Amino acid sequence: MRTALITGASSGIGLATARKFLEEGVAVVGVSRDRAKLDAAADSCADLSAPFFPFAADITADETPARAVKLALEETGRLDHLVNNAGVGSPQPVHSTDDEMLDQFLDLMLRAPFRLAREALAAFGDTATIVNVSSTYALVGGLRGGAYSAAKAGLNGLTLHMAAQYGSSGIRSNAVAPGVIPTPMTEHRLEVEAFRRMNYDMTPSARWGTVQDVAEAIWFLSSPASGWINGQVLAVDGGWTSTKFLTESALSSDRDDQPADWSHSGR
């Protein structure tokens, strides 16, 4: 049975992706640091077409990548897909991001995916896929969240490099760059009106994206249907990054983007 290793699998995009793979008959090793949420996620998937193997662990820990891949091989005898999804967000601008926060972001969203890919590459068979979950904020600049954008942009670079290096071995590497998706990670930001308008009012599709939208894109990039797609970063954002579209409400709104502390404004 084909097998996928999916990080951040206890909620949001990760859980939706796990469910999609399971519905398609692909076994899933789901990784999350939250044991209770992960067990609940596994229970919610019990009636689907393939087994869900929960693995509660911190993916930034040195031993986790090897242990996660080992579990997949022990349970099903193979590993075919890796989805690096786990992440965390922060609205902090560069000038107020300390080294501890910077290390946290780079460890979780760049170093851990790198190390997981390294372990998975050694375990893959003749054909396999890696899909990294990036962000539209790795494609365009934003007003805050510099460490997040930097980590995700690094993930894009890793994606392209692996596509070039391992494509001839039958291993495809792509990324999805979701727009702002309502999830437990983003719900606190969606309470801020300016943030909601910045994202919703600039989306031509005129709706919020869903975790299912992203899961479908990840599945597509992992399936034979995308067999000639390699080294791409697919924006899953309703057109947000492709246009300067603005609704009337956004065009008529007051602009409030000046830094509170002008000592960091470059003036």
Where are these regions (language model features)?
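Residue(s) in the substrate-gating loop at a strand-loop-helix junction
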Residues: 135
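Alpha-helical segment proximal to the catalytic Tyr-Lys
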Residues: 122, 164-168, 227
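C-terminal helical subdomain
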Residues: 175, 194-229, 236-238, 262-267
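Short, small/polar-rich loop/turn modules that mediate ligand/substrate recognition or access, typified
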Residues: 83, 167, 172, 229-231
